Amino acid sequence: MTKQFAVIGNPIEQSRSPELHHAFAEKTGVDLNYQKRLAPLDGFESSMRSFFAEGGSGMNVTVPFKEQAFALCDVLTERAQIAKAVNTLWMENGKLHGDNTDGQGLVAAIQALEWNLENTTILILGAGGATRGVIYPLVQAGAQKIVIANRTLARAEQLVDDLKTAVPQAQLQAISLNDLEGDFDIMINATSTSLSGDALQLPEKLQFKYAYEMAYGKPSSFIDQAKQRNVPYAEGFGMLVGQAIEAFYIWNGVRPQLKDFL
């Protein structure tokens, strides 16, 4: 019997999840159908629950419903608890289970690039939900120190405060975007400023070996500045594929190879 999956969000037309999951299915021999679902901004829960009531096997959650999905779950993975957001749902024994595969997607993408994560010092620009979701997996993969830089320093400090007990093996630090300096192994842009006219200028006293832009498919001043410095860079398509692979594995028990889809 064909398994039914969906991705839910608002807007949703831009999602590439159906093409990815159908490509994974073709490669692995899993019989599935994967659709986009547009939910009204005030209708996430009813739309999600009706999908599972109709026999749906699993659902991905995208903007703006990840925090709502987190709040509705009966059972959460450790990484979802830390992220306080859920992008992967499934039913088991009548209970709604939730996970967050975004951070694992980023780790898989960085590993596929053969950028070493072991004992690294990482700078993340931005202190929003995207950053919260990747800290724990980065530390699990070997990051030793993570510095979170944000325009509003208090928000970065709050995030460090929230997460330090979850990752005691790593050093977390908060700084203002105005105080960017020092040497880093990897710099990750988790802000949306690279996609707008409000682009951040990276100061000369800030040095980094690799640059990762979480967004993809749009002009990025962050990537432009990495190019100017001749720093190896990548944008977020690998992370998108990586998080989708992790969700596919949770649901179907088989893990496609990331390199086959980049």
From Swiss-Prot:
Q: Name one Pfam family in it.
A: Shikimate_dh_N
Q: Which Gene3D superfamilies match?
A: Leucine Dehydrogenase, chain A, domain 1 (3.40.50.10860), NAD(P)-binding Rossmann-like Domain (3.40.50.720)
Which SUPFAM superfamilies does the entry mention?
Aminoacid dehydrogenase-like, N-terminal domain, NAD(P)-binding Rossmann-fold domains
Q: Its Enzyme Commission number?
A: 1.1.1.25
Q: Which GO terms describe its biological process?
A: amino acid biosynthetic process; aromatic amino acid family biosynthetic process; chorismate biosynthetic process; shikimate metabolic process
Q: Name one GO molecular function term.
A: NADP binding
UniProt: shikimate binding residues: S15, R16, S17, T62, N87, D102, Y216
Question: Pathway listed for it?
Answer: Metabolic intermediate biosynthesis; chorismate biosynthesis; chorismate from D-erythrose 4-phosphate and phosphoenolpyruvate: step 4/7
Listed GO CC annotations: cytosol
Which UniProt key words apply to this protein? Amino-acid biosynthesis, Aromatic amino acid biosynthesis, NADP, Oxidoreductase
Annotated residues that bind NADP(+) are located at E78, G126, A127, G128, G129, A130, N150, R151, T152, L153, A154, R155, M214, G236
What are the positions of the active site?
K66 (proton acceptor)
Matching InterPro entries: Aminoacid_DH-like_N_sf, NAD(P)-bd_dom_sf, SDH_C, Shikimate_DH, Shikimate_DH-bd_N, Shikimate_DH_fam, Shikm_DH/Glu-tRNA_Rdtase
User: What catalytic activity does the UniProt entry give for this protein?
Assistant: shikimate + NADP(+) = 3-dehydroshikimate + NADPH + H(+)
Family designation: Belongs to the shikimate dehydrogenase family.
Function statement? Involved in the biosynthesis of the chorismate, which leads to the biosynthesis of aromatic amino acids. Catalyzes the reversible NADPH linked reduction of 3-dehydroshikimate (DHSA) to yield shikimate (SA).
Complex formation: Homodimer.
Q: Identify this protein by name.
A: Shikimate dehydrogenase (NADP(+))
Gene source species: Acinetobacter baumannii (strain AB307-0294)
